[in-house]
């Protein structure tokens, strides 16, 4: 079986263990891997772009060598002194294909992030935003987060990700049919034999947000976003010179107990998968409520979306 070439990125930076351990595990399975990640941590950067300054770009050959297991599969690692979305744009539409012609990605994986990306987190997260950016460019995408700060053991998150990548690989062609969106908003179907939801994923109009709990029970649930509220989210401080500074970071996080949501799944030890629309609903490529509901239908045995 030919393994899909993969684009990996994140918001924790090129040296983060979640990214490197995942890249190594995927390389072991034979996936050609192209990593382009921020040089420095870019957590909570959202969809920020670097527009006024040049960004340093470099290859990390020794780093790639240190994690490469499968000598027959390509693995190249680059960093960009920019944001996660900058990295995706450079990878897909910035001429990187001239530097790495041997790796043409079929799927983008953003992560594995340290910390949860649940509920409202998706709007701030650089990890989620990188996956969304790739999908906007027509590349099928997923993002993965370890939903805790209490440890950095990514073994469960990697196992879950490998299971999902294996399932997704059965659906995706080697060559993404809508990469760079050559027909703009006109392409509605990549394959008329597939369902509307499957086509939406292939075209980059739906992407998957995955969270794995602190201790995983080995099961997956396909669920909605939950209701998560950050309270006392800023802290004001002053010094003897009457200079005032603010620090943003919630002192209290409240999660509502709503069934079939990512917050509750994670609390109960399940990994959560939430299909997300890439575009606002009012956009020409925005998804109908019916299609989003279909995207949330799941296989009772596996917990995965039933359309995968």
Outline where the language-model segments fall:
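Electrostatically charged, flexible surface regions
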Residues: 156-308
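Short glycine-rich anion-binding loops that position phosphate/pyrophosphate groups of nucleotides
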Residues: 41, 83-84, 113-116, 215, ...
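Conserved acidic residues
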Residues: 106-107
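Hydrophobic/aromatic ligand-binding patch that stacks against planar heteroaromatic rings
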Residues: 25, 130-135
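A cross-family phosphate/adenosyl-ligand binding-site feature
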Residues: 2-9, 16-102
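Short beta-strand segments
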Residues: 9, 36-38, 110-113, 143-145, ...
